[in-house]
A protein has these predicted regions:
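Aromatic- and charge-enriched surface segment that lines or borders ligand/interaction sites
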Residues: 83-132, 166, 303
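Structural transition elements
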Residues: 333-373, 394-396
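N-terminal lobe/hinge region of extracytoplasmic solute-binding protein
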Residues: 39-90
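Gly/Pro-rich hinge or "lid" segments in bacterial periplasmic/extracellular proteins
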Residues: 163, 169-239, 243, 253
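Alpha-helical secondary-structure segments
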Residues: 112-114, 118, 162-166, 242-243, ...
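Detector for C-terminal structural segments
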Residues: 316-346, 393-403, 430-540
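Ligand/substrate-recognition segments at binding pockets and active sites
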Residues: 220, 364, 371-443, 513
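Ligand-site clamp/hinge motif
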Residues: 229-276
Length: 540
């Protein structure tokens, strides 16, 4: 997730969207001709976008909820709840959205401007647990509200009437419309929020959906659920599937087997499973705008409060070996926190990640020297490190790779790999109970600042406790330089250089997903940035 900042006006949202088309046929039961079988690799933590934010949740919300716009082919904005693409006024600081009057929730209630106000106020409140309140920065008073200095009612968003929403910004954000496709900005049924209170979104019966489908059968803990068409959806005539069935599948071999048995129409695979299927005609590679990395815990009582130890780990990991021999799914080595091909620096016309990659990304001799130096500075002869991952097979494999390299090459190092379910790993990490955490950041936008924001000292997702006034200053300047291309990208380069120097995160690889896809499946939008859209899917 997932997910998820400020952008330059010229950014391209959801760049590289691919429309999937069919070429041949899988055998399916006639009764299943309008049922789409899908998998997710992790648990849903909640359907409340103000309370949680992870990749599975956002994938589900993409099919069942809509904001002002949808992302179409090649990332083009398509009016959804809004009737048109809004042009700002007041020198770029005011957006007035007119909502379509035929938009309705799955329970029949009309979608109103107040539903957006309800959602955004809940998401910016200091009690929000999604970790995404920072994404509202730039909307009037959002930062002060999240810091507990102002009430949520002071947020710069107002329902002028039942179908008109006004948003006031603190400074011009020419990319603001592009943010409206994110699940963080989706509305919430005000009546349901009032009715269920803290239990809103804790199961599928406690949430209403305003998108093409509605979620059914999710109890809050189960690993299989379905989505059926929202009969009140304004574009119901273009929804062809009668049902989507989703299940959690964390193992690639299991995913492959289910695909072979026609129990999955889209199976994500990795590792040796993917390696053995590279010539399969149903295999599709999707490069995503995200990097898997090690989040280092910089707290004072932790070993990685020492910068030399962090740099030692960075230089000890052969990312090409990891990508080719462990992952084998098309993922590529990454030496920077920003994914390759995510964004081009327009002032240099170079790929940002490429131009900012350190000159050395693997040097075992130097790594050992830095490790010994760091251990001496800490006054220790040995150290035990806790590496927390989720319990997907691929995460376990990467964790074991890191464990092997660190224990084999660093004197006195022992690594405990804890591979636990997403809910457990999320809790351990948010509580600071880790030394290293294998995690993914999938950019919300095709711009480096989408990645950089979560490492600012005030960001609720900065679980590694990185605190750099210089880094914070670069991000603050970038937000206000949105209309000054040269200044903005200099801020971006400065921020990445600080990460290269401080190493609060150890980048590993740019995410590439390998999918086995039913060749009869068509109408799916796969995005390099953002969630896959199955709402207009059909079988040919």
């Amino acid at each position: 997730m997932k997910m998820k900042g400020m952008l330059l006006a010229s950014l391209t949202l959801l760049s590289g969207a691919v429309m999937l088309t069919a070429c041949s046929a899988n055998q399916r039961k006639a009764s299943d001709s309008k049922t789409l079988y899908l998998m997710q690799t992790g648990d849903i933590l909640s359907l409340d976008n103000s309370n949680q934010a992870n990749l599975t949740q956002w994938n589900v919300l993409e099919q069942s909820m809509e904001g002002m716009y949808r992302a179409g082919k090649n990332g083009k904005l398509i009016p959804a709840m809004a009737t048109s693409i809004v042009k700002p006024t007041n020198s770029g600081r005011t957006y007035t959205y007119h909502l379509r009057k035929n938009a309705r929730w799955s329970n029949g209630d009309p979608v109103t401007a107040q539903d957006f106000v309800t959602s955004w106020r809940r998401s910016t409140a200091p009690t929000s647990k999604s970790g995404y309140n920072y994404i509202f920065t730039g909307i009037k008073n959002a930062e002060q509200i999240s810091a507990g200095k102002m009430p949520p009612s002071s947020l710069g968003v107002r329902a002028l009437d039942r179908h008109t929403l006004r948003v006031d910004l603190e400074y011009a954000m020419p990319y603001f419309n592009k943010m409206m496709v994110m699940p963080a900005f989706f509305p919430q049924n005000t009546g349901y929020v009032k009715k269920f209170g803290d239990k809103y979104g804790t199961n599928s019966a406690r949430v209403a959906c305003n998108g093409a489908f509605k979620v059914q059968g999710w109890t809050g803990t189960n690993d299989k659920w379905s989505l059926t068409p929202n009969t009140h959806y304004y574009d119901r005539k273009n929804i062809r599937m009668d049902k989507m069935v989703m299940q959690i599948v964390k193992d690639s071999n299991t995913a492959h087997q289910l695909f072979q048995e026609n129990k999955l129409d889209d199976a994500q695979i990795t590792g040796t499973t993917a390696q053995g299927l590279q010539k399969n005609k149903n295999l599709m590679h999707l490069t995503r705008g995200g990097v898997y990395y090690l989040r280092m815990n910089l707290a004072e009582n932790r070993a990685f409060s020492n910068k030399n130890l962090r740099h030692a780990v960075y230089l000890a990991l052969d990312r090409n070996e990891l990508a080719k021999k462990v992952l084998s799914d098309g993922s590529t080595a990454s030496g920077t926190y920003v994914a390759r091909k995510l964004a081009t620096d327009p002032t240099t016309e170079r790929d940002f990640a490429t131009e900012m990659t350190p000159s050395e990304t693997f040097n075992m001799k130097k790594a050992k020297e830095l490790w010994n130096k760091g251990m001496k500075e800490l006054g220790k002869s040995s150290v035990t490190l806790d590496l927390v991952t989720d319990d997907q097979t691929v995460s376990k494999n990467v964790g074991q790779f890191v464990q092997s390299k660190v224990e084999t090459n660093f004197k006195g190092a022992k690594v405990n790999v804890e591979s636990v379910p997403s809910k457990s790993s999320s809790g351990k990490v948010s509580n600071g109970d880790f030394d290293m955490n294998l995690t993914l950041w999938l950019a919300d936008f095709a711009n480096p600042v989408s990645d950089f924001d979560i490492l600012s000292s005030s960001n609720p997702q900065n679980y590694g406790k990185y605190n750099s006034p210089s880094y914070d200053s670069q991000l603050s300047q970038a937000r206000r330089n949105g209309n000054d291309e040269k200044a903005f990208w200099q801020n971006m380069r400065n921020a990445q250089q600080l990460l290269n120097d401080d190493m609060p995160v150890v980048p590993l690889y740019t995410m590439t997903e390998s999918h086995l896809v039913n060749p009869k499946l068509s109408g799916v939008l796969y995005h390099s940035v953002g969630e896959t859209d199955y709402t207009r899917a059909y079988f040919k």
